[in-house]
Amino acid sequence: MASCPKAIWSWRFQRVVFRSVQLLCFSILIFELMTQKEVSAWTYHYSDKPYSWNYSRAFCQKYYTDLVAIQNKNEIAYLNETIPYYNSYYWIGIRKIDNKWTWVGTKKTLTEEAENWADNEPNNKKNNQDCVEIYIKSPSAPGKWNDEPCGKRKRALCYRASCQDMSCSKQGECIETIGNYTCSCYPGFYGPECEYVRECGEFDLPQNVHMNCSHPLGNFSFKSQCSFHCAEGYALNGPRELECLASGIWTNSPPQCVAVQCPALKSPEQGSMSCFHSAKAFQHQSSCSFSCEEGFTLVGPEVVHCTALGVWTAPTPVCKAIACESLESPVHGSMDCSPSPRAFQYNTSCSFRCAEGFTLRGADTVRCADSGEWTAPAPVCQALQCQDLPTSNKARVNCSHPFGDFRYQSTCSFTCDEGSFLVGASVLQCLDTGNWDAPFPECQAVTCAPLPNPQNGEKTCVQPLGGSSYKSTCWFTCHEGFSLSGPERLDCTPSGHWTGSPPTCEASKCPELSAPEQGSLDCPDTHGEFIVGSICHFSCNEGLKLEGSNHVECTASGRWTAPPPSCKVDTVSAPAPGLRCPSLIAPNQGTMSCQHHLRNFGLNTTCHFGCKAGFTLMGESALQCRPSRQWTAVAPTCRAVKCSKLPVTEPIVMNCSNPWGNFSYGSTCSFHCPEGQLLNGSERTACQENGQWSTTMPTCQAGPLTIQEALTYIGGAAAGTTGLVTSSILLALLRRRRRQKDDGKSPLNPQSHLGTYGVFTNAAFDPSP
C-alpha cells in the first residue's frame, strides 16, 4: 500500500478542515436517513467511520445502493476532487473472486482497459490482498487503486443510483451519469423516457380472407400479431401469421384466399370414369364415379368427392383381373410362373423344383383356374434321408439335424470311452445323395507295450480286455537271494502307457552293521555292501565279554543269521587289579547317586548329579567309569542362580549379605534413607531361586521437617563451620611443627595392601620410599 501523503498545510489547519468536513458529511447522512427522500441523480456518499471491506459494503447496501462502481476516468477525477482526504483511504466495489478482479455490483470481471492501478499494484502482499482501495487526494497517486487485505479498516465510498423502477417507462435501459441518467430504449420504443411504441399501420383484407389479431402494446403496433384463415373451399396463399416488427414494418404482405383444387383424375385401365363439376373441373364439391370392363372387378370406391381440403375422399379405384391366391417358392426350392410371375391371374402356370439334397413332395406344376383357385396345393421340398447309425460300435454319438433326423446335412461326431480309441472318421455328414460321407467308425481298446520278465524274477498279469490292453495289471517277484528294485505292480493306463518302468531283480543286501560299544567288527566286505553270503566277526575289549554270536552271515532273505552281539563286563572272570576310576563326591549344594557294577567307582560305574533349589548344575549330569580308568567327563559343580545387580542411587543406603556370591540366590539386601527422608517401598529384598528379586528397588523421598529438626540442622551447621575453622588452624600449626621435626621418612600409606578400608600397614614394613 502506498504511504500516506505529506501534509500540504499546517497540521492545525488540516485538522480543523478535516473535522469540519467530517461533521458536514455526518450531518448530511443523518438528515438523509431521517427523511428517506428519493433522489433523481447518481450521488456519492461515504462513511465517517472506517470499516472492513465486508462491513463497508453492508453499510452502503443498507443506506444507499452499493460500494461505488467506477465507469470511466471522468468519474475517478470527480471523486478525487469531491471526496475529502482520509489517511486510510476508501474501499470501492472491486474484489478478487475466483482469482479474478470483479465488480461486485454487476458480477462482471474487471477489463484491462478499465484498470486504474497505482504503480507496482496489485502486488498481493502475504497472499491475502483481495480487496481494493482508492487513493483519494493522494499526492503520489491521486485516484489510483491498490489491493489491500479485506480486514483492514477504511472508509466506505458508496453511491446511490439515479435509476428507479419506473425509469425509462420500463421500456429501455437506464444509464447512470454523474448527477443524472439517460434512457437507451429497447427496440420498438422511442421518446425521452421510451414512452412511445412504434406502429405498423392497418391493411385492407382481400376477399374471402378472415383475420384475428392481438395488440399487447396498442392497435397494430410493435409486437401486434395477426393470424389469417379462409372460408370453406378456399386455401390460403401467403403467410398464415404476420407480426409488427420493432422497425414499424409487418413481417410480410397479407395473404389471399383461392378456391381449393383437387388433383385431376383419369379412368382406370380396363374401366371408365364419369364426373360432375359445380364450377371448374376438379374443384371443391366435384364428384366422379367409376366402373370396370367385363372380366375385371373394381378395387376401391365407386364414387369419390373433392373436399374443402383439396383432396379426394378416397384414392382412385383400379380394375383388377380375377386372380388366384399368391404363391411362394418352397423352402429349399424355387418357383417359375408365366405369363405373370407376380399377379397370379387367370391361366397363370407355376412350376417348382428343389435344391440339391432335397426332393419335391407334391405336384411339380399348378395353374390358376377360372374359379380363382389353383389346380393343386403348392408342393414342399424335403431333405433326403440317410441310413440310421448302428448301435454296436461302442462309440458315443452326438448329432445335429438341421432338416430332420439323419437327413441331408445332418452331422454326427463320435467319441470313445476311457481306455479305447476311435478307428475311422470322428465326424460323419449326410450328403445330398442320401449317403454318409464315410463308413461308420468303431472303438477299440488301448494297448500298452508288452512287458518283459525281469531277470532272476517272474511276472504275473491279468488282462480283462486282451493282451497288454487298457485295465491290464502285472505283478513282479524275484528269485531267492534277489530283491525287487522298482514297482511291484504296473497298470495299463487309458493313455496306452504303464504306470511305471518295469522293475529289476537285484542281489539282496542285509542291514548295515556297526562295531559293538567297547568292541570291534571284522567283515570281508570292505565296501560295506553286506550282500548275501557276507560273514562278519565281533570281539570285545579287555575285561569285557561278548554276549551273543561272535559271527553272523547275510542270508538270501536279506537278514543276518543272528542279531548283532554286545560287550558286557565279565562277571565270571575277576577284573583286572586296579581297574577303577577316582572316587567322586557330591558337589557343594548338590546331590550324587551312583550304580556300582563290581566295586565302588569300578568299571562301568555310572554316577548321576543334581543341584538343590536355587543352584544350577555346571557340567555333565551323568558320568561313567571307562576301561581307561577315567570318567567320561569332569565332575560337575553347582553354582548359585544370579539375580540382576541392584542399582543404588543417592541418597538411599543399601546393606547386603551374599552367602553364595554377590547378588546370588540367598542374597538379602536392606535399605534405609538419611534422617529427614522416608523410604518409599519395601525395606528388604531377597534373591529368589528363579533369579528374581522378591521386591522392587525402593526410593527415598523428603519427609516433613519439624521445628526441632530445623533448629538441629541450623545448630549443626553452625557448629560444623566453627569446628572446620578450628581444625584448619590446628592442622596448619601441626604441619608446620612436623616440617620442623621431619627426619626424611615417608608418612604411613593410609591404604592397606589388601585394599580394605581402615586397615593400615606397619610403618616398619612400609615399602613406600
Curated annotation (Swiss-Prot):
Please give the organism. Answer: Ovis aries
Question: What spans does the record annotate as topological domain Extracellular, numbered to this chain?
Answer: 33-717
**What stretches pass through the bilayer?**
718-734
Tell me what this protein is called: P-selectin
Q: What is its main location?
A: membrane
Q: Which residues form the EGF-like domain?
A: 159-195
Notes on the domains: The C-type lectin domain is required for binding to integrins. Binding to soluble integrins alpha-V/beta-3 (ITGAV:ITGB3) and alpha-IIb/beta3 (ITGA2B:ITGB) is cation-dependent. Binds to the allosteric site (site 2) of integrins and activates them. The interaction with integrins may mediate cell-cell interactions and cell adhesion.
Q: Where is this motif: Endocytosis signal?
A: 757-760
Could you tell me which SUPFAM superfamilies the record lists for this protein?
A: C-type lectin-like, Complement control module/SCR domain, EGF/Laminin
What keywords would UniProt list here? Calcium, Cell adhesion, Cell membrane, Disulfide bond, EGF-like domain, Glycoprotein, Lectin, Membrane, Metal-binding, Repeat, Signal, Sushi, Transmembrane, Transmembrane helix
One GO CC annotation: external side of plasma membrane
What gene does this protein come from?
SELP
Q: Which cysteines are joined by disulfide bonds?
A: C60-C158, C131-C150, C163-C174, C168-C183, C185-C194, C200-C244, C230-C257, C262-C306, C292-C319, C324-C368, C354-C381, C386-C430, C416-C443, C448-C492, C478-C505, C510-C554, C540-C567, C581-C625, C611-C638, C643-C687, C673-C700
Which residue intervals make up region (Interaction with SNX17)?
760-769
